[in-house]
C-alpha cells in the first residue's frame, strides 16, 4: 500500500516536471505577441489576405474599406489608423456596429483585435 502511494507520487512528480518544462519552453512562443502600432505594418500584414475565424471572412484593404461576411450576413465598413489604433465603422447586414478603436496584436499567425483601445473584448483572426 505504501509502495503504491510512493509510486503515485513519483508519477505526479514526473508529470509535474514535464508540465513545467513544457511551459518554460513554450512560454516564449506563447508570449511573443507584438502590438501593431503603425498603419504600414498593419497594411503589410493584411495585404491580399483574408481575416478568418469561425463563420467570418473579412478583407481589410489599404484604401480604408472592410468587406466580407459573418454568420451569413454581408459585412462592410471603413477603417483608419488613429493614434496607434485600428478605428472602424461596421455594418453587419442591416445592423450598424458602433464606431470603435481597437488595439491590434500579432503572434506570427493570428491578428487579435482588442476593442475599446485595448481595454475591451478581443477577437483573433487567422490570416489566409
Task: Please state what every model-predicted region is.
Residues 1-14:
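N-terminal secretory signal peptides that target proteins for export/translocation
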Residues 10-12, 29-128:
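Lipid interaction determinants
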Residues 16-27:
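Bacterial N-terminal signal peptides
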Amino acid at each position: 500500500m505504501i509502495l503504491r502511494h510512493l509510486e503515485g507520487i513519483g508519477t505526479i512528480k514526473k508529470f509535474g516536471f514535464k508540465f513545467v518544462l513544457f511551459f518554460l519552453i513554450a512560454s516564449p512562443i506563447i508570449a511573443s505577441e507584438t502590438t501593431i502600432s503603425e498603419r504600414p505594418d498593419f497594411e503589410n500584414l493584411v495585404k491580399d489576405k483574408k481575416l478568418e475565424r469561425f463563420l467570418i471572412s473579412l478583407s481589410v484593404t489599404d484604401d480604408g474599406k472592410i468587406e466580407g461576411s459573418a454568420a451569413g450576413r454581408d459585412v462592410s465598413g471603413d477603417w483608419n489608423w488613429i493614434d496607434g489604433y485600428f478605428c472602424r465603422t461596421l455594418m453587419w447586414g442591416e445592423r450598424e456596429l458602433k464606431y470603435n478603436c481597437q488595439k491590434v496584436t500579432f503572434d506570427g499567425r493570428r491578428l487579435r483585435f482588442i476593442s475599446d483601445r485595448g481595454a475591451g473584448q478581443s477577437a483573433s483572426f487567422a490570416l489566409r
